[in-house]
Amino acid sequence: MGACGSVMQDEALKEQARIHRQIEKSLEKKKSALLEQSVLLIGPGESGKSTVLKQIRSVTVCRAMCGGYTKHELEEKKLLILRNLWTFSDMLLEYVIKNYLDMNETDKKKYKVMIEELKFCVMSGGHMGDELAETVKVFWLCAPIQEAYEKRNTYHLTESAGYFFENIDRIKMPDFQPTNQDIVRIRVPTTGVVTADVILKNIKLSVIDCGGQRQERRKWYHYFDDVHAVLFVAAISEYDQKLVEDESVNRMDEALNLYHIVFNGKYFTKAACILFLNKIDLFREKVKSVSIKKFHPGFEGANTAEDGAKYFRRKFRDGMHPDFKKRLYCHETCAISDQVQIIINTVIDTVVQENLKDTGMI
């Protein structure tokens, strides 16, 4: 019953609708109580796990038709966006200075002041205003900063930086309200364990998001019992990048090793296994100029997104314990795209369906 692939063809959508109707019918029998489902969300750092969690919340909010983020939560998101702009600006300027890119001393001093003003906005809970916003726009568009942004993979600057800089005119407004797309672009590394409970009709979905950095992983094992599904997120676009924690280790190799440890047969004997090969949009662009074989010598296909994705899917699958292969659901995703919500809808139904089978309800 395993499935692998990310394209929602007509037949797949019809099957999803059939499964959803079956689940709805089964849940009608248990109206008096919530069906509780738990999903463990794991993967290496920078893979996009927290973004997936935001999209899960967005999907369940839409399906339950119970409103969005609270006013207080949106205010927190606004401050996080400003914090991201402050951090991204600091990283870009630091790269320019350390690598002796062509920027005069006057501009360096001006942009250091700009960064301090962004910091003050964050600390004071204010908004940036027109004058500061204009300086940020000039900063973003200047040649050395653009050059530094193009080299972002070498110093762990995320692609969200460009998104927020391009949206300065909207973000600077006093009445700015973050959209769902803004929220999923926010970068805040997960430390510790974050649990989000979302309610969808008769389903209570508890999603446990565990920090992906190496020092956080020892905490995962406390959550390995009694989960209904494991959602593992790996950034397929990072096949040429190094770990933040260890510059000698390739990020894709780290993801593969971690995945095979998790699915070695000791844990999750009844849980659905779901793999998101995330950041597929960046992967499709990157393979146009960056060799897969250079970083993964075992790759023998054409240097295309199709052959590359097929190779990495096989690498993840081949190292699994045989019992898990028949329960693996693999999707190529872009967690910042609203289209991922279609996949997440399918994942939610998959988790519920597997549990209902185990309990004999369908």
From Swiss-Prot:
Question: Gene3D superfamilies from the entry?
Answer: GI Alpha 1, domain 2-like, P-loop containing nucleotide triphosphate hydrolases
- Positions bound to Mg(2+): 50, 190
Which InterPro entries does the record cross-reference, listed alphabetically?
Answer: Gprotein_alpha_su, GproteinA_insert, P-loop_NTPase
Example GO molecular function: G-protein beta/gamma-subunit complex binding
Q: Where is this region: G4 motif?
A: 274-281
Q: What are the boundaries of the region G2 motif?
A: 182-190
Domain (G-alpha): give its ranges. 35-362
- Extract the ranges annotated as region (G5 motif): 333-337
Q: Which SMART domains match?
A: G_alpha (SM00275)
Ranges for the region named G3 motif are: 205-214
Sorted alphabetically, the keyword list is: GTP-binding, Lipoprotein, Magnesium, Metal-binding, Myristate, Nucleotide-binding, Palmitate, Transducer
Matching CDD domains: G-alpha
* A Pfam family it matches: G-alpha
Q: List the disulfide bonds.
A: none
Biological process (GO) annotations held by this record are: adenylate cyclase-modulating G protein-coupled receptor signaling pathway
Q: Where is the lipid attached (N-myristoyl glycine)?
A: 2
Protein's UniProt keywords contain Secreted: no
| UniProt superkingdom | Eukaryota
Lipid modification (S-palmitoyl cysteine), residues: 4
Sorted alphabetically, which PROSITE patterns does this protein's record hold?
G_ALPHA (PS51882)
Indicate which residues the UniProt annotation says bind GTP: 43-50, 184-190, 209-213, 278-281, 335
- Family that this chain belongs to: Belongs to the G-alpha family.
Give a short account of what the protein does.
Guanine nucleotide-binding proteins (G proteins) are involved as modulators or transducers in various transmembrane signaling systems.
For this entry, the protein name equals Guanine nucleotide-binding protein alpha-10 subunit
Name of the gene this protein is made from:
gpa-10
